[in-house]
């Protein structure tokens, strides 16, 4: 996943809503939305896998701990994404959980494993083009 768009020094805090929109490449195999403090400290990594290894049309969620590595993956079959189409994902969180609303209105939850109350880096990587980021 070499293509990347990022927003640094963004004040994403408890009670706020982060909406990320973009367009999935027509030949996509995967793309990810990441929320954290740095590229080696990611609290929420949501990897959209269209066809990657043995994974077909699945969301893989994880977190990356600095100097430790990736943690236990969680998977969801909620996958309203289509190659070549627009997507919009809205994320909010508390000290226990990330609440991720997908384009079709379905929600996926993922633990806020470090109990963080604020993040300053959002980035999209892989086979999609970022069109907007909105923080409310």
Swiss-Prot record:
Ranges of residues in domain Galectin: 4-136
One GO MF term attached to the UniProt entry: carbohydrate binding
Binding site for a beta-D-galactoside: 70-76
N-acetylserine modifications at: 2
Any Gene Ontology CC annotation: extracellular space
Classification via Pfam families: Gal-bind_lectin
Keyword Ubl conjugation: no
InterPro entries hit by this protein: ConA-like_dom_sf, Galectin-like, Galectin_CRD
Keywords from the UniProt entry: Acetylation, Lectin
SMART domains membership: Gal-bind_lectin (SM00908), GLECT (SM00276)
Domain of life: Eukaryota
PANTHER family listed in its UniProt record: GALECTIN, GALECTIN-1
Function: This protein binds beta-galactoside. Its physiological function is not yet known.
Name of this protein: Congerin-2
């Amino acid at each position: 996943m070499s293509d990347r768009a990022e927003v640094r020094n963004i004040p994403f805090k408890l009670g706020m809503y982060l909406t990320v929109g973009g367009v999935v490449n027509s030949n996509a195999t995967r793309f990810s939305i990441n929320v954290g403090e740095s590229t080696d400290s990611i609290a929420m990594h949501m990897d959209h896998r269209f066809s990657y290894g043995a994974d077909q049309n699945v969301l893989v969620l994880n977190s990356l701990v600095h100097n430790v590595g990736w943690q236990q993956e969680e998977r969801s079959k909620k996958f309203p994404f289509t190659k070549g189409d627009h997507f919009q994902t809205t994320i909010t969180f508390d000290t226990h959980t990330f609440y991720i609303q997908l384009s079709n209105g379905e929600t996926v939850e993922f633990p806020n494993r470090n109990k963080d109350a604020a993040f300053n880096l959002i980035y999209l990587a892989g086979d999609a083009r970022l069109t907007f980021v909105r923080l409310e």
